[in-house]
Curated annotation (Swiss-Prot):
A single GO cellular-component term on record: bacterial nucleoid
HAMAP family associated with the record: NdpA
Family: Belongs to the YejK family.
Organism from which the protein derives: Haemophilus influenzae (strain ATCC 51907 / DSM 11121 / KW20 / Rd)
Name of the molecule in the record: Nucleoid-associated protein HI_0839
Amino acid sequence: MSITVNQTVLHQLVKNVDGDSIKMESVLRDELLSITPEVEQMMLQLHQSYQNKAKAFGVFQEKSIFAQHLNRLLEQEIEFLGFSQYSTKLLADELGKYNFAESGTLILCQYNFLATDYLFIALLDSRHSMLVDEHLDIRRTEYLDITQFDIAARINLTDLQVNANSNRYLTFIKGRVGRKISDFFMDFLGAEEGLNPQVQNQCLLQAVSDYCDQGELNKEQTQAVKKQVFEYCKGQLSNGNNIELRELSDSLPTLNEQPFVVFTEKQNYGLEESIPPIRSTLKSLTKFSGSGKGVTLSFDAELLNTRIQWDPMTDTLTIKGLPPNLKDQLQKALKSEN
């Protein structure tokens, strides 16, 4: 799917070291980028890369300076170029507080995707490489790394303007450098964490278990319901969609004359109507898994108390019928010892 680029610009942050002090200086463009096929292709790649990264949700704090200027932009009180220049200086001031600060290219882009307006902000690194020119000579070149970036945020402008109480209009990349982002990029935005997808997924799993318990389902019936929930969530995940609570409820059996969505509301699980799915958490609906002290185990939940027995008194698992490939490895190891 394509995106429609409305406005975009690049500015640079340059690191200057003077003794023990670090200062980030901003090099600002004085005009927006022309929307050429190359610019559109670059933004499409950035959009696709961002879509595939692990993200957390955020909201603006009440006194966010960035949010105040963003609001002025949306109210058409200032132009996009002026907004981008001010934002770059704001980021330079924040980034200069940290020893790990490095030079980079800041991109700000306002674009539309699937009838939704977004503001994308990312700090991109430059990479060095070699190219062969028309004379077959080798030359050094520098390029923007638009696939491997980890300092970025995106604001859903449509959601921000339509739903003031939303807790998911801002997303940012989380991961190995999550601390960096929380330390300076979120401070630059004047934002704090909003919706927590991990907590929402865990609450959903607990709600499903409790729903089966209050419905007095036996083990097989409970496993069937959990598998049904997992298949729905897996489908949503594969299609890049959220878990829609009412849609999920409609697919489940009504227990004790109470649909699943009504049960969750009455029990105050605090579930959102739309929940971003997390694959690793949802797997526990149908599997038991764990690792530690050199052992990693994972098996289907339906095998417990059939092929797999757990004795809590001795803290042991007994497995009847090992996987053929594991059995083969064990037999080879036994022969080599003898």
